Amino acid sequence: MNVRAFSTMSPEDLRDVRALFLRQAAAETAHDIEVMDSILARPPAGQPDPVNFVARAYTFWGREAVLDHFRAVFAGTWQFEPDEDAMRVIPLGPDTAHLYAPTRITAGAAGQPAATFQFLVNEIAIRTADGWRISAIVPVPTK
């Protein structure tokens, strides 16, 4: 048994992961690609890119592919509204956390009517040399 895998995170770490996600939510609604770039993990030199976005309709592997996806959706209507009271940060180890947030997303292509959908957003945050960063984004539609 790997005892380290069951180590708890500090209350400060839990707050930092939560704050990172809320920063992401604000950046998405503001269509701020620079902040989105800052919250995604960067691989250490010589290591594989840990960033991915896996949805029912599509997948994106790597930071640049994920950022390109957000650049595309930011061209239209995009609002990202997590239910902060229902958010959960679940430690998976001292340097990894699962973040869960029921979220309302309003989306629409530029010049087209937008629609609102409910998702159960699941993300993995990892501790990096630069602090906590997002490595995986998995939005699960509720319907």
Which residues does each PLM region occupy?
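Short beta-strand edge/turn micro-motifs at domain boundaries
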Residues: 1-2, 118-143
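Short, cysteine-centered beta-strand-loop-beta hairpins and adjacent loop/turn segments enriched
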Residues: 77, 105-115
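A solvent-exposed, acidic/Ser-Thr-rich amphipathic alpha-helical stretch
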Residues: 14-15, 33-93, 117
